Amino acid sequence: MLSYRHSFHAGNHADVLKHTVQSLIIEALKEKDKPFLYLDTHAGAGRYQLSGEHAERTGEYLEGIARIWQQDDLPAELEPYIGVVNHFNRNGQLRYYPGSPLIARQLLREQDSLQLTELHPSDFPLLRSEFQKDNRARVDKADGYQQLKAKLPPASRRGLVLIDPPYEIKTDYQAVVTGINEGYKRFATGTYALWYPVVLRAQIKRMIKELEATGIRKILQIELAVRPDSDQRGMTASGMIVINPPWKLEAQMNNVLPWLHKTLVPAGTGHATVSWIVPE
């Protein structure tokens, strides 16, 4: 079942949170000269046209990236991420949104590498064309969860693994935990960043319980809600679960998350939290 297209949702509040966390982790990994791997299990198309039919139909980016990218009081923690957004929108008009692979491409160094996976028959060719001239990148049409077995550990023993499936089938909530556990067995020192949507809170609670049961330590949870939890249809919040986070990440997110919540949610509904699921 491959009906999900991220082009309908690109640049929304969930992308803002996900890509803020992603960019801060990458910047932390760059503090050492040694190369690292960026592995993206569900990479999508790479870039998204915000004036395109899909993005215009939902308008989700108007309540996401459009609310923050030109703010005068932008916190320092957002500079790497917004710098990439600006790179793709140099005329001051918000026309394109870079997905996680393009954010990684802009922030990674020459010595680093990218392993990108996408299974959707429409998105894969778009992703491949974005990276055909980048010799740091390998783009595969494959099952992202299988890559956690096949591509880990990297030779450098350093890396960020981003896992953000569409959750269009309920088994994704279990598959992400199984995938992380398989990856962790092979690469216990890597940083794993798992994105999740809050549609039904009970699903997230179950997923976190299963993650705790793996015995993995150092699990940080970052969540941004735009509305209170609800049993109605639709995403009320999203979060990032980070295993082996860089030591600065907790403080960085505690600093920037209140600003993001205030700017993205003028009505003040929902919440913004940073907490440990499992400490060291």
Predicted regions and their residues:
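Class I S-adenosyl-L-methionine-dependent methyltransferase catalytic core
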Residues: 1-280
